[in-house]
A protein has these predicted regions:
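Tandem repeat domain/solenoid detector
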Residues: 23-376
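Gram-negative bacterial Sec-dependent N-terminal signal peptides
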Residues: 1-22
């Protein structure tokens, strides 16, 4: 008859701790398979819940509510472990989760909190880390993943001065940050490796900032913003990377910078009838890069700078007061710019071979100045 060794004798062990006063501390350590650890703390201040598990298929849960200066720390080593931390109606709270292995799942939920922080660290493959913050003030969420086939998600809604940061190093990772109906929110995605995807979505927000930085090959990055006073910064360094920025609202700014070969950049901005002051900038260095800028509204400025060969820049501006300043250096560059409205201006310089400029302006007081140097421009 098969028997478990002493090291895994903690199989199917359930540990539960409940506390309803101040300065409570609960520490749980488990070794084995399919262990379950639970901590429930409510009220008071200075509560601490610390859980450590090593093995396979373990589950750790912490619930803290109606308290201040509370801390939840969960550490798991092994495979197919689950860590869940829930904090509600708390102030000055922090939740930290550390996992090593593969197939692990970490979740942090913070609701109605003030000055909350969530930190998740995962090392391995096929891990999932998710953070949900709702109705929070001055909240922050940081997720760091190392390995491949990992998924990181940060969702912040109805928040003030929220910040989400996702860092991934490896291959075939997916990072997603969603911020909804928030004020002064900020999203940062940093990816290193190959075949990674980054998505930042900021919906109905005011003063939102999105930053995406990717270094490697065949990475895709997309930013979508709706609301007022947006800023999007994207840096893509490597080969065959793609950048997509979509902004809708007023007072938008988009900046995309790419290094390498075969890069693709696209910026789309749309305004309300009374909006304006949008800016779109793309800078590309390398070979076979593309830049596409599409603006609707008023008082917009588009700037594209391309160095290298086979670059293509296409700009479409509609409205009034638009300006475009472009510079192309290299071989086989092409620019197509269309402006509709009044007070539009296009000024550009093309250096190299086989450059082509096609400019169309409709309206009044438009100015187009293009200088081409080289052969067969």
């Amino acid at each position: 008859m098969f028997k478990f060794k002493p090291l895994v004798a903690a199989i199917l062990t359930v540990a539960t701790a409940q506390a309803f006063a101040a300065n409570n501390t609960s520490e749980q350590d488990q070794l084995g398979i399919n262990n379950v650890a639970q901590v429930l703390q409510s009220g008071g201040s200075g509560n601490l819940a610390k859980q450590g598990q090593s093995g396979f298929g373990n589950q750790a849960t912490v619930e803290q509510s109606h308290s201040r200066e509370t801390t939840a720390t969960q550490s798991q080593a092994g495979n197919y472990n689950v860590a869940d931390a829930q904090q509600s109606a708390t102030a000055l709270t922090a939740a930290t989760q550390n996992q090593r292995g593969w197939g692990n799942d970490a979740t942090v939920e913070q609701t109605g909190t003030y000055k909350t922080g969530a930190t998740q660290n995962q090392n391995g493959i096929h891990n999932v880390a998710e953070t949900f913050q709702t109705g929070t003030t001055t909240s922050s969420a940081t997720t760091e993943q190392t390995g491949k086939h990992n998924y990181g998600l940060i969702t912040q809604s109805a928040a003030i001065n929220s910040q989400g940061k996702l860092v991934q190093d490896g291959e075939l990772n997916n990072a997603s940050i969603t911020q909804t109906a928030s004020w002064g929110d900020r999203a940062l995605v940093d990816q290193r490796g190959t075949d990674n995807d980054a998505h930042v979505t900021q919906v109905a927000s005011l003063g939102s900032i999105a930053e995406v930085e990717q270094v490697g090959w065949r990475n895709d990055a997309m930013v979508s913003q709706t609301g007022h006073q947006h800023e999007a910064y994207m840096l893509s360094d490597g080969n065959n990377n793609r950048v997509d920025i979509d902004q809708s609202g007023n007072a938008q700014n988009a900046f995309a910078l790419q290094y390498g070969n075969g890069n693709d950049s696209r910026i789309t901005q749309s305004n309300s009838p009374f909006g304006g002051n949008n800016t779109a900038t793309t800078e590309q260095f390398g070979t076979a890069n593309e830049a596409d800028i599409n603006q609707h509204g008023r008082n917009q400025t588009a700037k594209t700078i391309q160095h290298g060969g086979f670059n293509v820049a296409s700009v479409d501006q509609q409205g009034r007061g638009n300006e475009l300043h472009f510079q192309q250096d290299g071989v086989g560059n092409e620019l197509n710019a269309v402006q509709n409205g009044s007070d539009n201006e296009i000024v550009g310089v093309s250096h190299g071979w086989h450059n082509s400029s096609d400019i169309e302006q409709t309206g009044g007081d438009n100015l187009a100045t293009v200088r081409q140097e080289g052969t067969l421009n």
